[in-house]
């Protein structure tokens, strides 16, 4: 259902798949990774805040076609521990995926201003890179 919605919105706005970025918070991070890593063609980027990798099964078979990934997590997260992001980072990197990460000091299960700034800059860079290869 989510993939059909994404496809419909891209079509409605006459945008290529490379103009898609998925951003999620908590469970939304898990959804963004699950959908974004399986989409063909891949989105330009996935930004995940305070989440985790839902399952190793979502890792793509061809990491060369994977989106850029940024994971941001608070070191004081009481809902989804920081270890979940560290494990996700390790699994994504081991699968050959381009993953960047940031630990937000003193942040619980939320997003601070620095995390928003990093996410915005990451998306801007990913969209620029995707546009240059169209």
Question: PLM features: residue spans?
Answer:
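Primarily recognizes the serine-hydrolase "nucleophile elbow" in alpha/beta-hydrolase
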Residues: 10, 18-65
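Short, proline-enriched alpha-helix->beta-strand connector loops that line the catalytic pocket
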Residues: 17-18, 64-69, 95-98
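C-terminal catalytic histidine-bearing segment of alpha/beta-hydrolase fold enzymes
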Residues: 83-134
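Short beta-strand/loop motif that positions the catalytic acidic residue
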Residues: 70-73, 77
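A short beta-to-alpha transition loop/helix N-cap that caps and shapes the active-site region
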Residues: 53-58, 79, 111-112
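Short, hinge-like loop/turn segments at secondary-structure boundaries
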Residues: 62-66, 118-121
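Alpha/beta-hydrolase active-site loop
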Residues: 1-12
């Amino acid at each position: 259902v989510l993939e059909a919605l994404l496809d419909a919105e891209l079509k409605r706005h006459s945008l290529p798949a490379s103009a898609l970025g998925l951003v999620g918070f908590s469970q939304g991070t898990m959804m963004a990774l699950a959908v974004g890593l399986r989409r063909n063609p891949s989105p330009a980027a996935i930004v995940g805040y305070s989440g985790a990798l839902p399952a190793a099964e979502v890792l793509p078979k061809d990491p060369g076609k994977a989106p850029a990934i940024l994971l941001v997590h608070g070191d004081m997260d009481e809902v989804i521990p920081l270890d979940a992001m560290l494990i996700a980072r390790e699994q994504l990197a081991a699968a050959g995926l381009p993953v960047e990460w940031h630990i937000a000091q003193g942040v619980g299960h939320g997003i601070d201003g620095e995390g928003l700034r990093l996410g915005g800059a990451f998306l801007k860079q990913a969209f620029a890179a995707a546009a240059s290869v169209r």
